[in-house]
Amino acid sequence: WSMPIYPTAGHDRDSLANALFYHYQIHGVKLGFHPVYRLDKDTSGLIVIAKHGYAAAVLSKSIEKEYTAVCEGVLKGEGTIDVPIRLKEGYTIQREVAKDGQRAVTHWKVAGGTNHHTLLQIRLETGRTHQIRVHFSHIGHPLAGDDMYGGHLNGIGCSKVLFVHPVTGHRIELTCPPQDDMMALVQ
């Protein structure tokens, strides 16, 4: 099930912002809607929303995210992809690996797989648009489900978020299991 973060054409009533403001309304709460980070359109999983802009700004500088993804083909062990990414010339959304792009670093570790797909745990050192998708396509293992960069089916989700609560100072760890359709690819 896909839910956009903000209302868009075709999704003017079923966004996360709509749902949260409805929740605020029925509970008589007046708070803001401040996503701490964004997820690409077809990425499932955890999203952290701050109640205040200041909290979002503080959290955005210190939040740690881990992704679970399924790529096509077989990878072994762990590794780092450290190649720059830029907007692909002539496109408004699509990115590509290019020497004159922005630095982009992706750390990955194999967590399972089959003869056709590999389950990965991924941590980003940088946060470029489509970074995971572009990097794995670049090394010849596009994400399952990524029709823009060469994959098939749905293959990425934000599975873990760690942060220090901006008011209490407590360390918070949130986890979310991968979607069933993604896990079916590696079982």
What are these regions (language model features)?
Residues 36-37, 86, 109-112, 164:
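Conserved positions in beta-strands of structured domains
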Residues 112-117, 125, 133-187:
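Pseudouridine synthases involved in rRNA/tRNA modification
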Residues 71, 107-110, 143:
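Conserved hydrophobic positions within beta-strands
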Residues 66, 80, 103-105, 117-119:
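Intrinsic-disorder/low-complexity, polar/charged segments enriched in Ser/Thr/Lys/Arg/Asp/Glu/Gln
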Residues 63, 76, 98-106, 155-156:
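Short coil-to-beta-strand transition motifs
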Residues 72, 121-125:
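A structural micro-motif recognizing beta-strand termini
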Residues 1-80, 84-90, 181-186:
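RNA pseudouridine synthases
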